[in-house]
Amino acid sequence: MKNILSWMLMFAVALPILGCDNNGGSQTSAMGKDMVEDSVLTDNQKLSRTFGHLLARQLSSTEDFTLDLTEVIKGMQSEIEGKSAPLTDSEYETQMALVQKASFEKKCSENLASAEKFLKENKDKEGVIELEPNKLQYRIVKEGTGRVLTGKPNALLHYTGSFINGKVFDTSEKNKDPILLPLTKVISGFSQGMQGMREGEVRVLYIHPDLAYGTSGQLPPNSLLIFEVKLIEANDDNVSVAE
Protein backbone atom coordinates (compact mmCIF):
# COMPACT_ATOMS: atom_id res chain seq x y z
CA MET A 1 0.00 0.00 0.00
CA LYS A 2 2.80 2.43 0.87
CA ASN A 3 4.39 1.69 -2.51
CA ILE A 4 1.15 2.54 -4.27
CA LEU A 5 0.77 5.83 -2.42
CA SER A 6 4.37 6.72 -3.20
CA TRP A 7 3.83 6.08 -6.88
CA MET A 8 0.59 8.06 -6.81
CA LEU A 9 2.62 10.99 -5.49
CA MET A 10 5.07 10.49 -8.34
CA PHE A 11 2.12 10.72 -10.75
CA ALA A 12 1.29 14.15 -9.41
CA VAL A 13 4.87 15.32 -9.86
CA ALA A 14 5.28 13.81 -13.32
CA LEU A 15 1.95 14.75 -14.89
CA PRO A 16 2.86 18.36 -15.74
CA ILE A 17 5.82 17.22 -17.86
CA LEU A 18 4.15 14.28 -19.60
CA GLY A 19 2.14 16.33 -22.07
CA CYS A 20 4.91 17.08 -24.55
CA ASP A 21 8.51 16.29 -25.31
CA ASN A 22 11.48 18.54 -24.64
CA ASN A 23 11.45 19.80 -28.22
CA GLY A 24 7.92 21.16 -27.92
CA GLY A 25 6.54 18.43 -30.18
CA SER A 26 3.07 16.97 -30.07
CA GLN A 27 1.92 14.84 -27.16
CA THR A 28 3.02 11.21 -27.28
CA SER A 29 0.30 8.82 -26.13
CA ALA A 30 0.03 5.05 -26.04
CA MET A 31 -3.65 5.32 -26.91
CA GLY A 32 -4.74 5.61 -30.53
CA LYS A 33 -1.22 5.65 -32.00
CA ASP A 34 1.03 3.05 -33.53
CA MET A 35 3.94 1.86 -31.40
CA VAL A 36 7.18 3.66 -32.24
CA GLU A 37 10.25 1.49 -32.64
CA ASP A 38 12.62 1.86 -29.69
CA SER A 39 15.49 2.67 -32.03
CA VAL A 40 13.84 5.89 -33.24
CA LEU A 41 12.49 7.15 -29.92
CA THR A 42 13.73 10.50 -28.68
CA ASP A 43 15.41 10.66 -25.29
CA ASN A 44 12.24 12.15 -23.82
CA GLN A 45 10.12 9.38 -25.33
CA LYS A 46 12.46 6.72 -23.94
CA LEU A 47 12.31 8.32 -20.51
CA SER A 48 8.52 8.59 -20.68
CA ARG A 49 7.99 5.03 -21.83
CA THR A 50 10.39 3.65 -19.23
CA PHE A 51 8.53 5.61 -16.56
CA GLY A 52 5.39 3.81 -17.73
CA HIS A 53 7.09 0.42 -17.46
CA LEU A 54 8.30 1.14 -13.93
CA LEU A 55 4.89 2.41 -12.93
CA ALA A 56 3.05 -0.62 -14.30
CA ARG A 57 5.56 -2.98 -12.69
CA GLN A 58 5.16 -1.30 -9.33
CA LEU A 59 1.36 -1.20 -9.41
CA SER A 60 0.91 -4.76 -10.69
CA SER A 61 3.33 -6.31 -8.19
CA THR A 62 1.75 -4.97 -5.01
CA GLU A 63 0.44 -7.58 -2.58
CA ASP A 64 -2.24 -5.29 -1.17
CA PHE A 65 -4.62 -4.87 -4.07
CA THR A 66 -4.52 -4.39 -7.80
CA LEU A 67 -5.37 -1.18 -9.60
CA ASP A 68 -6.80 -1.25 -13.13
CA LEU A 69 -3.80 -0.05 -15.14
CA THR A 70 -5.97 0.82 -18.13
CA GLU A 71 -8.02 3.16 -15.97
CA VAL A 72 -4.86 4.61 -14.43
CA ILE A 73 -3.64 5.55 -17.91
CA LYS A 74 -7.05 6.99 -18.80
CA GLY A 75 -6.99 9.02 -15.60
CA MET A 76 -3.58 10.44 -16.46
CA GLN A 77 -4.77 11.33 -19.94
CA SER A 78 -7.92 12.96 -18.58
CA GLU A 79 -5.90 15.03 -16.12
CA ILE A 80 -3.60 16.26 -18.89
CA GLU A 81 -6.67 17.23 -20.95
CA GLY A 82 -8.16 19.12 -18.02
CA LYS A 83 -11.12 16.78 -17.52
CA SER A 84 -12.67 16.02 -14.13
CA ALA A 85 -11.90 12.83 -12.22
CA PRO A 86 -14.77 10.45 -11.34
CA LEU A 87 -14.12 11.11 -7.64
CA THR A 88 -13.29 14.32 -5.83
CA ASP A 89 -10.03 14.43 -3.89
CA SER A 90 -11.98 13.98 -0.67
CA GLU A 91 -13.95 11.01 -2.03
CA TYR A 92 -10.74 9.44 -3.32
CA GLU A 93 -9.04 9.76 0.07
CA THR A 94 -12.05 8.26 1.85
CA GLN A 95 -12.33 5.33 -0.55
CA MET A 96 -8.58 4.68 -0.55
CA ALA A 97 -8.59 4.66 3.27
CA LEU A 98 -11.38 2.06 3.26
CA VAL A 99 -9.52 -0.11 0.77
CA GLN A 100 -6.32 0.22 2.79
CA LYS A 101 -8.11 -0.71 6.01
CA ALA A 102 -9.77 -3.77 4.46
CA SER A 103 -6.47 -4.89 2.93
CA PHE A 104 -4.64 -4.46 6.24
CA GLU A 105 -7.24 -6.43 8.18
CA LYS A 106 -7.19 -9.22 5.59
CA LYS A 107 -3.40 -9.41 5.76
CA CYS A 108 -3.51 -9.46 9.58
CA SER A 109 -5.92 -12.38 9.57
CA GLU A 110 -4.04 -14.36 6.92
CA ASN A 111 -0.64 -13.88 8.54
CA LEU A 112 -1.91 -14.80 12.00
CA ALA A 113 -3.46 -18.00 10.66
CA SER A 114 -0.20 -18.87 8.89
CA ALA A 115 1.83 -18.18 12.04
CA GLU A 116 -0.34 -20.38 14.24
CA LYS A 117 -0.41 -23.18 11.68
CA PHE A 118 3.38 -23.06 11.37
CA LEU A 119 3.99 -23.21 15.13
CA LYS A 120 1.50 -26.04 15.58
CA GLU A 121 3.27 -28.15 12.96
CA ASN A 122 6.79 -27.06 13.86
CA LYS A 123 6.60 -28.06 17.55
CA ASP A 124 6.54 -31.76 16.64
CA LYS A 125 9.67 -31.59 14.51
CA GLU A 126 12.88 -33.17 15.78
CA GLY A 127 14.96 -30.92 18.00
CA VAL A 128 12.33 -28.22 18.44
CA ILE A 129 11.75 -27.10 22.04
CA GLU A 130 8.69 -25.10 23.03
CA LEU A 131 9.31 -22.38 25.62
CA GLU A 132 5.78 -20.99 25.57
CA PRO A 133 2.89 -23.09 24.20
CA ASN A 134 2.08 -22.13 20.61
CA LYS A 135 4.02 -18.87 21.01
CA LEU A 136 7.77 -19.43 21.27
CA GLN A 137 9.99 -22.27 20.08
CA TYR A 138 13.67 -22.82 19.40
CA ARG A 139 16.01 -25.36 17.86
CA ILE A 140 19.73 -25.67 18.55
CA VAL A 141 21.77 -25.77 15.35
CA LYS A 142 25.18 -25.85 17.03
CA GLU A 143 25.99 -26.45 20.68
CA GLY A 144 27.97 -23.80 22.53
CA THR A 145 30.78 -24.45 24.99
CA GLY A 146 31.05 -21.08 26.70
CA ARG A 147 29.20 -19.36 29.51
CA VAL A 148 25.43 -19.55 29.83
CA LEU A 149 23.31 -16.49 29.18
CA THR A 150 20.89 -15.77 32.04
CA GLY A 151 18.74 -12.82 32.99
CA LYS A 152 18.45 -10.00 30.45
CA PRO A 153 21.97 -8.73 29.74
CA ASN A 154 23.59 -7.22 26.74
CA ALA A 155 24.68 -9.82 24.23
CA LEU A 156 27.25 -9.73 21.46
CA LEU A 157 25.80 -11.77 18.64
CA HIS A 158 25.09 -12.36 15.00
CA TYR A 159 21.51 -12.76 13.83
CA THR A 160 19.48 -13.22 10.67
CA GLY A 161 15.74 -12.58 10.70
CA SER A 162 13.38 -14.10 8.14
CA PHE A 163 9.72 -14.79 7.48
CA ILE A 164 7.99 -18.15 7.08
CA ASN A 165 8.69 -18.06 3.35
CA GLY A 166 12.42 -17.74 3.99
CA LYS A 167 12.70 -14.11 2.90
CA VAL A 168 15.33 -12.32 5.00
CA PHE A 169 14.21 -8.96 6.40
CA ASP A 170 17.27 -8.12 8.50
CA THR A 171 20.71 -9.47 9.32
CA SER A 172 23.82 -8.40 11.18
CA GLU A 173 25.93 -10.39 8.73
CA LYS A 174 25.81 -7.53 6.22
CA ASN A 175 28.20 -5.60 8.47
CA LYS A 176 30.35 -8.70 9.12
CA ASP A 177 31.08 -7.65 12.71
CA PRO A 178 28.73 -8.97 15.46
CA ILE A 179 26.30 -6.54 17.05
CA LEU A 180 25.92 -5.71 20.75
CA LEU A 181 22.22 -5.83 21.68
CA PRO A 182 20.61 -4.82 24.98
CA LEU A 183 18.11 -7.65 25.39
CA THR A 184 15.79 -5.39 27.38
CA LYS A 185 15.23 -3.33 24.24
CA VAL A 186 14.32 -6.07 21.76
CA ILE A 187 11.04 -7.92 21.21
CA SER A 188 10.15 -10.22 24.10
CA GLY A 189 10.25 -13.38 22.00
CA PHE A 190 13.85 -12.68 21.04
CA SER A 191 15.11 -12.02 24.58
CA GLN A 192 13.15 -14.94 26.06
CA GLY A 193 14.29 -17.28 23.31
CA MET A 194 17.95 -16.51 23.96
CA GLN A 195 17.89 -17.32 27.67
CA GLY A 196 20.03 -20.35 28.49
CA MET A 197 22.19 -20.05 25.38
CA ARG A 198 25.89 -20.77 25.76
CA GLU A 199 28.53 -18.66 24.10
CA GLY A 200 29.26 -20.16 20.70
CA GLU A 201 25.78 -21.65 20.40
CA VAL A 202 23.70 -21.19 17.27
CA ARG A 203 19.97 -21.27 17.90
CA VAL A 204 16.92 -20.74 15.68
CA LEU A 205 14.00 -18.91 17.32
CA TYR A 206 10.41 -19.21 16.12
CA ILE A 207 8.40 -16.27 17.43
CA HIS A 208 4.62 -15.78 17.36
CA PRO A 209 3.56 -12.23 16.37
CA ASP A 210 2.20 -11.67 19.90
CA LEU A 211 5.81 -11.87 21.12
CA ALA A 212 7.15 -9.92 18.15
CA TYR A 213 5.70 -6.82 16.47
CA GLY A 214 2.07 -7.89 16.20
CA THR A 215 0.17 -5.58 13.88
CA SER A 216 2.51 -2.62 14.38
CA GLY A 217 5.96 -1.81 13.07
CA GLN A 218 7.40 -1.78 9.55
CA LEU A 219 7.06 -5.50 8.86
CA PRO A 220 3.91 -7.13 7.45
CA PRO A 221 1.29 -7.30 10.24
CA ASN A 222 1.10 -10.44 12.40
CA SER A 223 4.23 -11.93 10.87
CA LEU A 224 5.80 -14.95 12.52
CA LEU A 225 9.51 -14.20 12.79
CA ILE A 226 12.35 -16.68 12.54
CA PHE A 227 15.76 -15.69 13.87
CA GLU A 228 18.99 -17.63 13.57
CA VAL A 229 21.16 -16.35 16.40
CA LYS A 230 24.80 -17.03 17.26
CA LEU A 231 25.82 -15.89 20.73
CA ILE A 232 29.39 -14.59 20.64
CA GLU A 233 29.67 -13.14 24.13
CA ALA A 234 27.39 -12.46 27.11
CA ASN A 235 27.74 -9.65 29.63
CA ASP A 236 29.98 -10.72 32.54
CA ASP A 237 27.47 -9.52 35.13
CA ASN A 238 24.69 -11.69 33.75
CA VAL A 239 26.21 -15.04 32.91
CA SER A 240 26.82 -18.28 34.71
CA VAL A 241 29.79 -20.54 34.13
CA ALA A 242 29.02 -23.57 31.98
CA GLU A 243 29.42 -26.82 33.83
Swiss-Prot record:
Q: Where is it chiefly localized?
A: membrane
Annotated GO biological processes are: protein folding
Report the GO terms under cellular component. Answer: cell outer membrane
Query: What are the PPIase FKBP-type domain coordinates in residue numbering?
Result: 152-235
Which compartments is it annotated to reside in?
A: Cell outer membrane
| Membrane topology type | Peripheral membrane protein
Could you confirm whether the keyword Signal appears in this record? Answer: yes
Give the molecular function GO annotations.
peptidyl-prolyl cis-trans isomerase activity
* Keywords noted in UniProt: Cell outer membrane, Isomerase, Membrane, Rotamase, Signal
* Cystine bridges: none
Task: Write out the catalysed reaction.
Answer: [protein]-peptidylproline (omega=180) = [protein]-peptidylproline (omega=0)
Q: Which domain of life is it from?
A: Bacteria
The cross-references to InterPro entries, in alphabetical order and at most eight, read: PPIase_dom_sf, PPIase_FKBP_dom, PPIase_FKBP_N, PPIase_FKBP_N_sf
A Pfam family found in this protein is FKBP_N
Q: Does Zinc show up as a keyword for this record?
A: no
Q: Provide the E.C. number(s) assigned to this enzyme.
A: 5.2.1.8
Which N-terminal residues, if any, form the signal peptide?
1-14
Q: Which PANTHER family match?
A: 39 KDA FK506-BINDING NUCLEAR PROTEIN, FKBP-TYPE PEPTIDYL-PROLYL CIS-TRANS ISOMERASE FKPA
Would you identify the family this protein belongs to, as annotated?
A: Belongs to the FKBP-type PPIase family.
**Function, in words:** PPIases accelerate the folding of proteins.
Q: What is this protein called?
A: Peptidyl-prolyl cis-trans isomerase Mip
| Species this chain originates from | Chlamydia muridarum (strain MoPn / Nigg)
Q: What is the lineage of its organism?
A: Bacteria, Pseudomonadati, Chlamydiota, Chlamydiia, Chlamydiales
